[in-house]
Amino acid sequence: MQAGNNGGAKLKNDEFDNLYQKNINRRETETVIRRSIPVQRDLTGKILPNQVAYYEEIEREVTFGATHHILDKDNFDSYIYPTNFEVREYQFNIVQKSLYQNTLCAIPTGMGKTFIASTVMLNFFRWSKNGKIIFTAPTRPLVAQQIKACLGITGIPHDQAAILLDKSRKNREDIWTQKRVFFTTPQVIENDLKRGVLNPKDIICLVFDEAHRATGSYAYTNVVKFIDRFNSSYRILALTATPGTDIASVQEVVNNLNISNIEIRTEESMDIIRYMKKRYKEKIEIGLTTEIEMIIEQLGIAVKPVLQQAVELGIYDECHPSQINSFVAMQKSQQIIANPTIAEGIKWRNFFILQLLNHVGQMLKRIKIYGIRSFYGYFRNKFSEFTTKYNMGKSTNKIAASFYYHPILKILMKNCDVYTSNSSFIGHDKLQKIINELSDFFLNSRLDSRVIIFTELRESALEIVKTIDNMGSSSIRPHIFIGQARGKENFDDEGFIRKNKPKGRKKADRLKRLEEDKQKQLSKAKQKEQEKVERSSRRTGSSEEAQISGMNQKQQKEVISKFKNGDYNVLVCTSIGEEGLDIGEVDMIICFDTTGSPIKNIQRMGRTGRKRDGKILLLFSGNESRKFEKAMEDYYDLQRLIGQNFVEYKKSDRILPSNITPECRKEFIHISAENNELNNMEDSDEVIRYATQCMLGKVPKSKKSKAKAAKEPKGKSKTFFMPDNVETGIVSAIALVNKKKSNSNESETVIKTECFPNLDDIEKDMLASLSSPVKPEVDDYKDGTFQKTDRFEEKITGSNLKDMLMSFSKRDEESKVTSFSSDGNYVNEPFGNISLGEKLDINDDFASTPIVKADMNIGQYDRSLIENNSRGGVLFKNAFEKEEGLLKKSEKVYFRDHYSIDNTVVIEPIPNFKRYNKSCLINHNPQVENILNLFKGINENKTQITIEMNRSRCIARGIEKGSIQLTGSDFSLANVMVAQKNNEADIVWDTSKTNKNSHENLNELLDSDSDF
């Protein structure tokens, strides 16, 4: 395909699909059929304009080629059906269809969904040589159930299985590579697919538990979408008891999971009814007490003016005050806020009216369904919050004020205070019914019987626990079972008043307020601690504490364990107990409230009747019975629609060759000792821990493997999974254009210029290097001359200029120095023969830093000493041996022979106090003495000091302009001589190498006392 001038030809959707190759063996052909339709014509027979003479029918046919998985030809001629348990016809039929199609298995709870999944996983494990089989569930207990079923029933080798539940990613890539059967959560799969740790093309079987969650952007949906980009040849098995609430939600699950077939069974299905344990449903309608009816009437009187105003404004339908619905009021308030055509003032007035109706609707719901205690706790919190804000002027909502300040509510609150102050008061007849049912049940039931009570509200769950505990029966032991979130705290009116009251401007007022806040916090903390101690002394203390702070996973596991062991025999649950609780000893379920969701109702009722017959007690009050019947009716209609093929399925790959039809082999599976151990475990965490140990124990790591692993880099590069026949990597721009050969004869010239620092910078750093004596440094010595290095270029600065010109270290008298003779040759002369008055000529290459000494006798190290010692050792190091310091041994010997202890400073990191233990005053060295004299003269404004400073500046400018040159291996000046007068080093000009004009100008500068 060639690009034109318009920027390139456009690709059609099918061409994009072919280029992308998102499906390995999936092919989709589209057929468009046009069918004519009647149209209007004029008198001449022509079709009138703007009419379509036909409509299009689009037919899509999906075909699959050979799978890319490596199949085991010795095994795919048969499939195994375990006979370790009773062979059930519905399970056998579902397994047979699930092997060839992506299946949604919707059967009642306790009917063996895990056995079906394990059988399918076992056969795909046999059919493929390296395909990955993954089971995923949203919670750890559900994963543990499948581990028991898969390893403890079907006999899949435990050394081929892996459990991926922890957040740690250590060795995750190796586990995905080495193992074949995996038990994990969908979030782990999604993250590892995105990180490139798991190759989507390796997956051959994927099992989803609680598949009704595969809606929206849940992890189930994201996993399938990601795999479909690279792999279409894999089997999906979706397990659930309730596929959805309506046909639309079921269709969404089918689309998201690529379902080709739905196997749905109900409790009335012919092939399942004989395996179902009997569940006796008892529906009891509970009436309202006189106290509740009185409170409802009082609320209606207080809210009636607001309701009439809402009806007159047309924002709420007319109804009796006792029938106000909180959900309807909330929906209408959201519609008003989202409507931009309404004026702001009218919009917020209507919003506050509906907000109040929403709160009143919540109050009515609580008092009708849960009782007076639950209602009054909610009412008291709302009343305290509004009145506190309104009295302080923080709220001006007069609509709500007309309700909360209604006189009849004072009577209501007074009566409720009397009711709730009595611990034995029963706020709803549902609670009395629970007491009666539990008394009769445990009187006639087995010793190992258990009861689960479901309610939606935490405060209602705690009230049920306290009510049962007040019975005083030792045979009934209740406990709460809720989620991890902390309980919502009530409105703190004292804290709000203290925070928003006028603050004094004085410091004393602020300190007083801070002290009051501190005292309030301390008293509040003491009160909470005291309440906690009081709770711990009661039988329901752990339930009360859980209602306040929530229950973490450890506490939840402990409660379930005690419930199974019999420490508790009544469990009061919120929605957290609707899924995953597989306790066969539960003989009765009590639904304290009901919901409009058939999924929740069925999940609740499915907690009993698993190992033996059970009883379901449904308590209704208000409109709950009508809501329950409507939800169940919709559920049965949904099952009927699914059975009548009202769902559009997606075609899936058969995976096995079309000419192969495996035969069923019903076999008794012999379970290994390790796998059989799982069948004796009840705790889900114990199952996961044991399976993990088996997985890790079969892969011992030898010492050699550890050594090899240590050499490997810690961070492995991310793997990007791409479709087949795709050019990977980054293509550089130069690879996309025509290359031009360059002329190889062309030469490149690099000009290097030396840059000297500005004099201003030199002057600032004048005294930077005049510190304690330092070790002389030399550069590499080659062919009898010192070679110039970059290090020297950095050292020619004004900070050490005076040292270079005026200071030299004390040397051996027998040492020699290399100088130029008259004929230009090198001459080695003893250093002692050179006087300060002589002219010293050296090259630009400066190799050492001279040091000033008081006697100014010039000496130098022998060259062999420089070559052997100056570069031979490391100047700086982290550790020093005993009797070792910054100086080398030869240097220590030299300084010990030529300098007395009184005139030297120990510069070793660790002073040798054993040798130099005499305390005395140490004189300043000449450099420090010169610095002190220099600053002393500056403070006293001495003219001679100013002239000396200007003299140094002149020398620096001479070096910059070239009047002074640095040449040779030893230090000398081209036109400057060093002389000694009165033990002071003076600089004189050598007139033989400068012209007269420059000599006169320089003398004028040197003799002047100007400050430039």
Swiss-Prot record:
Its main location: nucleus. Its EC number is 3.6.4.12. It is found in: Nucleus. This is ATP-dependent DNA helicase MPH1. Residues 511-537 have a biased composition (Basic and acidic residues). It comes from the Eukaryota. Residues 430-654 form the Helicase C-terminal domain. The keyword Nucleotide-binding applies. It holds the Pfam family Helicase_C. ATP binds at I107, P108, T109, G110, M111, G112, K113, T114. Belongs to the DEAD box helicase family. DEAH subfamily. FANCM sub-subfamily. Residues 493-555 are annotated as: Disordered. ATP-dependent DNA helicase involved in DNA damage repair by homologous recombination and in genome maintenance. Capable of unwinding D-loops. Plays a role in limiting crossover recombinants during mitotic DNA double-strand break (DSB) repair. Component of a FANCM-MHF complex which promotes gene conversion at blocked replication forks, probably by reversal of the stalled fork. InterPro entries: FANCM/Mph1-like_ID, FANCM_DEXDc, Helicase/UvrB_N, Helicase_ATP-bd, Helicase_C-like, P-loop_NTPase. A motif (DEAH box) lies at residues 209-212. GO terms for biological process: DNA replication, Okazaki fragment processing; donor selection; double-strand break repair via synthesis-dependent strand annealing; interstrand cross-link repair; negative regulation of strand invasion. GO terms for cellular component: nucleus. Interacts with the MHF histone-fold complex to form the FANCM-MHF complex. The gene is MPH1.
